[in-house]
Amino acid sequence: MRWRCALLTWIPLSVGLAGALTLRQGDRNSAVRVTIYEDLQCPDCATFQRMLDEKLLPRYGAKVVFEHRDFPLARHTWARKAAIAARFFQGVNPELAVTYRRYALANRRQINAANFEERLAAFAKDHGVDPQKAVAALQDPGLDAAVEKDFQEGVARGVSKTPTVFVNGAPYIETFTFEELSKALDAALVAAR
């Protein structure tokens, strides 16, 4: 499988809150904004991630900004830890954060609560990051607060399922097609001219 390159940036949300970063892919200056509330243990989020990588970013990455938000569902035993780990990797390198998110989603059937830290340490080591620091980051209150901030923002916007994707404020919930998002993005791009 070939991955297309997308512009990745991170932007601090507030000074002093460790890990409080918004992970953005695509054109960060675009007037058209896609906000993605995701759970890294969610099968529908894994399907959406493939759509994002294979269709949305190649077609819209130069024209639209895609912003990731963490929304770990309580029923998923390791989703919150995965969100915290993704925030840790984001502080190391935004591209590594995207790689970790892809990894967690692609390997969600092999990862479980019992082996989560072992899998996290192996991922870190494979990507040149100190495994002990990656595992220790799971206890970082700043990273946890950043995940919680995203979660509470999602709750305030009515998010209860993942993925929930907002295209310029209009929600697409859990299962939707590329064609539905493409139509909304095309209309938003025309309106933004």
Locations of the language-model features?
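Positively charged n-region of N-terminal signal peptides that target proteins for export
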Residues: M1-R4
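Bacterial N-terminal signal peptides
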Residues: A6-G16
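A short, compositionally biased
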Residues: V15-G19, G158-K161
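A short beta-strand-turn-helix
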Residues: G19-V32
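Extracellular/periplasmic catalytic domains that process cell-envelope and extracellular macromolecules
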Residues: D27-S30, P58-G61, W78, A156-S160
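Residues at or immediately flanking beta-strands
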Residues: R33, K63-V65, T164
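Structural alpha/beta surface segment adjacent to cysteine/selenocysteine redox centers
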Residues: E38-L40, A46-K125, A191
